[in-house]
Amino acid sequence: MVFSSNVFLFLFLPLFLGLYYLSPARYRNLLLLTASYVFYAWWRIDFLGLFAAVTVFNYWIGLRIGAAGVRTQSAQRWLTLGVVVDLCVLGYFKYANFGVDSLNAIITSFGVEPFVVTHILLPIGISFYVFESISYIIDVYRGDTPATRNLVDFAAFVAIFPHLIAGPVLRFRDLVDQFNHRTHTLDKFAEGCTRFMQGFIKKVFIADSLAPIADHCFALSDPTTGDAWLGALAYTAQLYFDFSGYSDMAIGLGLMIGFRFMENFNQPYISQSITEFWRRWHISLSTWLRDYLYISLGGNRGTTFQTYRNLILTMLLGGLWHGANWTFIIWGAWHGTWLAIERALRIDAAPKTIRPLRWVFAFLLVMVGWVIFRAENLDVAWRMYAAMFSFGDWTLSDLNKAQLTSLQIATLLLAYVVIAVYGIRQFYAQPLTGAPKAKANDQADAPQGIVHASSGTLAYSQAIDIPALATRVAVLLLFAASVLKLSAQSFSPFLYFQF
């Protein structure tokens, strides 16, 4: 089941919210767990057993680590067991096919018969719930959070359906207090509804309209320079609106039931370096990689060479996390290499006068990276790169022009206008001081995004805010249009579901 589907909007969500608010507070976590398992099993019920087994295993490992004591040798052994088992589960389901295919490519070149194995189906969301489980047992080992004895709360944390399929990558230590004591207010619910609609518009109205452009361009067997750059521009916008749209919807759903998740995007395309980009893009993953992988490898505590090695290795593994394909590994290496280069050149200390050039350069680096990220294989990636940097025919091919519509081109222009307007507003409103954190306090500032969702509602405002009222009306109208568009296409999967 996905958020952008009729069955979720018109059946699952209303039924769940009705039962949730009619239930006594002490039963709401259990109801949330049950609903999340139904949400997951809607895809394939046979993988629900694996999901539950991983959850129970890490709950038990957490108890063993907690009983052994913080950072003791016994706790370290339990932690090692937990991490190894988690990675083996992830490795088998996500990377076994890739490993066998890569091995077969090598041995067949020497005339050896290839291995024949049954294709292994990738369980949806496994990358997210395994990473969240690993972060929990590491936090227990480090003493950052106590081991919970409440299996229902822990299982609900791992399974909570707003973030289950494609993040954000949550941490138990950030949400444990909210599982025990969270408040439900009309203000918070209204904020959640606005945020959900905002994400829905991003996904259905913009990202889904851009998808055909990228698909057509990447499918061309002989793209022109114009085709290749159009495809890169379209996918760059599509991926942002698709993934940030999902994150907005997840955050909004969390607010509807009293949770406040961490922000996952902070206008990444205004970044002036790759380093800044990773402070703004997929923040929950980038901070996870920093806290649990980069620091564990040694971070910047060793020699200069070791620091650069740790940066590149972290991004290589981050690329591999996205998918079992050489394209993702190379994409990770691309970002890791530029992170190391920027650290060596002290890019953050560059003069302010060259900021526009830094922004253009950083955006081009990100977009070039998205090409291999989107490509189905290396052949497609090299074909796109060859067309992009041949700087030959800037016109679109006849096949591409025949498939493109005026509405698609208009949506692409609109997407970049939205990125520019809100990016500029964010740039001048406040400097980036670090990754946004999850906030449990009901008085926390409302999150920022394509539309600013005020924590107040019209019913309780002391004075009518005309711009805010106009924004809400626009959001409602666009949401209604997006629902009609969804009803026509019936199903709209998110790009990050494949990871």
Curated annotation (Swiss-Prot):
It comes from the Bacteria. GO terms for molecular function: acyltransferase activity. One of its GO terms (biological process) is alginic acid biosynthetic process. GO terms for cellular component: plasma membrane. Keywords: Acyltransferase, Alginate biosynthesis, Cell inner membrane, Cell membrane, Membrane, Transferase, Transmembrane, Transmembrane helix. It is an enzyme of class 2 (transferase). Pathway: Glycan biosynthesis; alginate biosynthesis. It is a multi-pass membrane protein. InterPro entries: Ac/AlaTfrase_AlgI/DltB (IPR024194), AlgI (IPR028362), MB_O-acyltransferase (IPR051085), MBOAT_fam (IPR004299). The active site is at H322. It is found in: Cell inner membrane. The chain crosses the membrane at residues 7-25, 40-62, 78-100, 115-137, 150-172, 239-261, 312-334, 354-373, 380-397, 407-429, 475-497. Its EC number is 2.3.1.-. Together with AlgJ and AlgF, forms an inner membrane complex which probably interacts with the alginate polymerization-transport complex and adds acetyl groups at the O-2 and O-3 positions of mannuronate residues. Acetylation of alginate increases cyst resistance to desiccation. Belongs to the membrane-bound acyltransferase family. This is Probable alginate O-acetylase AlgI. It comes from Azotobacter vinelandii.
